[in-house]
Amino acid sequence: MLKVITKEIPINEELKTRIQFICDFCNTTPTFINGSIRKVEKTNINYIEPNKIIIKGTTFLAFNHGRDVYVENLQKHINISDLQEFIKNL
């Protein structure tokens, strides 16, 4: 039987601070949910679950040390520098 090991990855403080700063300008409060690494024991299969940031009911996904955030899924991404304008249009 396969055993899946899950280890939580806390969101990077620099990323968290940047997003909080952007949200302050947009008069909104983000909710942060830490990502995780899921590893199938005795294999080389790993899955990195991104950090989730919920802003105005929209879920954004972000990886630590990344420059992009993803909107709802990993198909649509925007640069963190464009996040403020995107939030204003929500």
Language-model-derived ranges and their functions:
Residues 23-81:
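Acidic, low-complexity, intrinsically disordered interaction modules
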Residues 6, 12, 16-23, 27, ...:
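Residue-level detector of alpha-helical secondary structure
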